[in-house]
């Protein structure tokens, strides 16, 4: 029960969202009316092609013309997520990306290494360098990432030169 969850959430943030393309305006209002008092944030989002192997437009018949938050669709060189997140799968394999459902971006295994070791691993840092050096397009998975064109909350491209310099200095100091 969502009402119970919200009342007992503690420090957990409850976020409600739904794709707006498949529901009517009346259903959109109903969504806000039903869930608005039982969450910290609520929103309607656009469909986004986050997974390269899944064609959202083909599956839904809806042409995607804006980003998930109604922003313009733009290409970026650098993924911000790899600098503040990673995903631990149920089997202990660690991916550099929360969208890596096919497990093509594995950077470690928590059964063999600590999260700190994986976070600071050569594999993970090489991926970060590739992005900071503007070579994301060379990566077989990251190259076609719809998350970065359609869903990006943080664009760090304007800071890419200084971040690259600082990241290289950080790696050299270790």
Where are these regions (language model features)?
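Conserved AdoMet/S-adenosylmethionine-binding subsite of the radical SAM
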Residues: 1-64
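Charged, glycine/proline-rich intrinsically disordered loops and linkers
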Residues: 53-70, 164-171
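Short secondary-structure boundary micro-motifs
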Residues: 69-72, 92
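Nucleotide-sugar-dependent
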Residues: 75-77
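Short, small/polar residue-rich loop motifs at catalytic or cofactor-binding pockets
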Residues: 80-82
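Short, acidic, Ser/Thr-enriched surface-loop or helix-capping motifs
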Residues: 88-89
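Flexible mid-to-C-terminal extensions adjoining Fe-S/redox cofactors in radical SAM and related proteins
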Residues: 94, 99-174
């Amino acid at each position: 029960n969502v009402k119970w969850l919200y009342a007992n959430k503690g420090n957990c943030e409850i976020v409600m969202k739904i794709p707006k393309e498949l529901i009517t305006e009346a259903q959109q209002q109903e969504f806000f009316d039903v869930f608005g008092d039982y969450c910290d944030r609520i929103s309607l989002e656009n469909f986004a092609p986050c997974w390269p192997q899944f064609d959202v437009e083909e599956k839904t018949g809806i042409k995607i013309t804006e980003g998930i938050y109604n922003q313009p669709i733009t290409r970026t060189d650098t993924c911000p997520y790899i600098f503040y997140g990673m995903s631990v799968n149920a089997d202990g394999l660690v991916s550099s990306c929360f969208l890596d459902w096919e497990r093509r971006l594995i950077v470690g295994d928590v059964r063999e290494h600590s999260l700190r070791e994986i976070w600071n691993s050569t594999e993970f840092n090489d991926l970060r360098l590739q992005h900071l050096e503007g070579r994301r397009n060379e990566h077989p998975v990251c190259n076609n990432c719809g998350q970065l064109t359609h869903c990006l909350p943080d664009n760090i491209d304007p800071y890419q030169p200084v971040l690259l310099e600082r990241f290289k200095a950080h790696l050299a100091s270790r």
